[in-house]
Amino acid sequence: MRQAPGETIAEPARRIPVYGHCDVLVAGGGPAGLGAAVAAAREGADVVLLERYGHLGGLSTGGLVFWIDRMTDWQGRLVVGGIGRELLDRCGRDAVLGPPPELWGAQEKEAVAYWHIRASAHRGVVTWAPTVDPELLKCVANDLVREAGVRVLFHCWAVAAIAEDGQVRGVICESKEGRFAVLAKVTVDCTGDGDIFAAAGAEFESDVEEATIHARVNTSFRFGNVDLARYLDFRLHQPQEHATLMRQAVAAGVELRVHATPYDSVALFMTPKFSGYSAIKVADLTAVEFRSRDAMRAGLAWFRAHVPGFERAWILDTASQIGVRHSRRLVGVERVTLSRWKAGGRSPDSIGLCPGLTPEFPTLEIPYGCLVPRRLEGLLAAGRNLSCDPQAHNPLREVPECWVMGQGAGVAAALAVRQAVPPRRVPVPALQATLRQQGAIVGA
């Protein structure tokens, strides 16, 4: 293809049909969007949820990022409740791999060693960071939106904001039916990339530190027909041999890390992670898809030949959704910074919690203001496109925190509609009280 930098065409003006009106429109059905839609509907709002794929859950399901890191703090206290906890509970024990509550916060050597190789013990502490069956999680997500009365539209992509005089009134979607508009009193951008607030003219940031993990992109995959118990036993009882084997893999160009899953025959891989790519450039995203699958095939051959438990493994699936960690971040009325976090992390307008990065960090109270644009009205943003600095972004982009922010944004949107006020004018005490009624853990 011959590139054409600077060349443009004129798109003729046309009338766009209005698909419908609603109280709250949620763009994106990932963890944040699911939380927002269900929370708003449970408060009586008429909610429409738009999702470009054919399932809910976003990266936690279609992206195969079903390692839910973390639901507890370093002392073993549950810090994520509400809709996130409900989703995991409704998946059932057989579909969720993680330590029982009596071990949360444990520091005994044997417990830490056992759960460390199952990704639920870090820095010498057992945490509740479970892995979950992504297909069952999709089904449970469907149950929640249907029970709440959310109107879901799959296979349509919110591509533009409808904004007049600084007021967002809805979005324009593309679909197999063609282009249409959905109008709303409050719109919640849960696209992950801030597509709607960027299109509406909100200020945003996109700077990252290239050496950090959240500057990297990959497509996750799973191997089937694995003897996972044998592999985990080898890793637990022969740690030096395992470490040597993984160094040999890296030397051979295979940089894969095994994640345990709820099922003994399935292994998850969320590596290798590729840096130097933009999550909002199609050529870069395409390159990552090719590189990820090349790495998967090479990794399968090496693991079959060298790694205990993988002798008869085969490719089970690859993620339908690419694993993006960072793109755009809102410039909000408040901004979470690492220095603020280190200083105590308290927020009078807290909507939920995020466990500290390390045991030395306090639990962060996530401020409502980091979901509110500095200037635009009628819009909230929730998920990894929140308002924060690059250093604080890494833990805040995780699935549990997206559930938390989504639920906070959904309740706020419903209250804004009920009280006929802009989202930035929603009374914080009422917001926090309603979140607690929904089972959320608001304050540390």
Feature map (PLM): residue ranges:
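Extreme N-terminal leader/targeting segments of oxidoreductases
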Residues: 1-24
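Conserved N-terminal/central alpha/beta ligand/cofactor-binding core
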Residues: 2-5, 45-46, 52-160, 215
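Core beta-strand elements of the Rossmann-like FAD/NAD(P) dinucleotide-binding domain
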Residues: 20-22, 177-186
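N-terminal Rossmann-like FAD-binding beta1-loop-alpha1 element of flavoenzymes
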Residues: 24-47
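Short hydrophobic core segments
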Residues: 27, 182-192
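Mobile, glycine/GP-rich and aromatic-enriched active-site lid/loop segments adjacent to catalytic centers
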Residues: 103-131, 135-139, 147, 207-382, ...
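Conserved beta-strand-loop-beta-strand element in the redox core of flavoprotein oxidoreductases
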Residues: 162-181
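Flavin (primarily FAD) binding-site architecture
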Residues: 189-203
